[in-house]
Amino acid sequence: MVTKTNNYPSLVKEIRKQLDLSQEDLARELGVSFATVNRWENGQVRPSKLAKAQINAFCSKTVGEGRLKLSGLWR
């Protein structure tokens, strides 16, 4: 489902916005720390390969549940 994006700060913010999640909530869902999500959103670091897989799985799940719409988010 998730392909490639170079704009992880916008992607993470949009996922949180659509799902009405705080950074802490998203961190819990992805199994990472609040600080990690915060650094992704602020563009300080890019998600690791493992984190990208976690984001992919989370997005696939929430899209399947009809809670998330990804059109326009992926390149």
Show where each model-derived region lies:
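Short alpha-helical DNA-recognition segment
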Residues: D20-N38
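Short amphipathic recognition helices of helix-turn-helix/homeodomain-type DNA-binding modules
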Residues: R67-R75
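A short, Lys/Arg-rich alpha-helix, primarily the initiator
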Residues: M1-Q18, N56
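DNA major-groove recognition helix of helix-turn-helix/homeodomain DNA-binding modules
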Residues: K49-L68
